[in-house]
């Protein structure tokens, strides 16, 4: 029997480099950024959760549960992951950011295969040059470990997953899959790339 997999799309940040605009709701080619991520992920998972700390009503319009961080204060992606891990009953939780509109359509399949092959606790995606710390497939049972890490004042996801049996899943055959949008300039470049 294949494992049940849920996903959380992280849209809980402050988006300082986007002038404070809520990145998930910024339009890219006539669609909110998060809609691109939803469309890529939806066929790959059982349920989608959205982690958002503002504009929750707008995010709820996409038809998925919207979760705010358990700990207020914009503690970063780890806080959103911890919240989602506490809400899922799935065997695995896929984590993706809201500002990656070109996510692989075989993301779950390949990450799950990598975990199975290595008997690992989680997988992190790589574009062939660097790991993508907010593109993870992991067991929700790791929530306690992640919460202890965050409670100790730590914030860097890669430091946390380095403490666990984490396999790197290579997507160098799709080098643009994890291109994300942090600035208006990047948004323009990506918009042009998608249009062609």
Curated annotation (Swiss-Prot):
Pfam families: NTP_transf_3 (PF12804). GO terms for molecular function: GTP binding; metal ion binding; molybdenum cofactor guanylyltransferase activity. It is found in: Cytoplasm. GO terms for cellular component: cytoplasm. GTP binds at residues 10-12, 23, 51, 69, 99. InterPro entries: MobA-like_NTP_Trfase, Molybde_CF_guanTrfase, Nucleotide-diphossugar_trans. Its main location: cytoplasm. Its EC number is 2.7.7.77. Mg(2+) binds at residue 99. Gene3D superfamilies: Spore Coat Polysaccharide Biosynthesis Protein SpsA, Chain A (3.90.550.10). It catalyses: Mo-molybdopterin + GTP + H(+) = Mo-molybdopterin guanine dinucleotide + diphosphate. Its cofactor is Mg(2+). Keywords: Cytoplasm, GTP-binding, Magnesium, Metal-binding, Molybdenum cofactor biosynthesis, Nucleotide-binding, Transferase. It comes from the Bacteria. One of its GO terms (biological process) is bis(molybdopterin guanine dinucleotide)molybdenum biosynthetic process. The N-terminal domain determines nucleotide recognition and specific binding, while the C-terminal domain determines the specific binding to the target protein. HAMAP family: MobA (MF_00316). Transfers a GMP moiety from GTP to Mo-molybdopterin (Mo-MPT) cofactor (Moco or molybdenum cofactor) to form Mo-molybdopterin guanine dinucleotide (Mo-MGD) cofactor. Monomer. Belongs to the MobA family. This is Molybdenum cofactor guanylyltransferase. It comes from Shewanella loihica (strain ATCC BAA-1088 / PV-4). The gene is mobA.
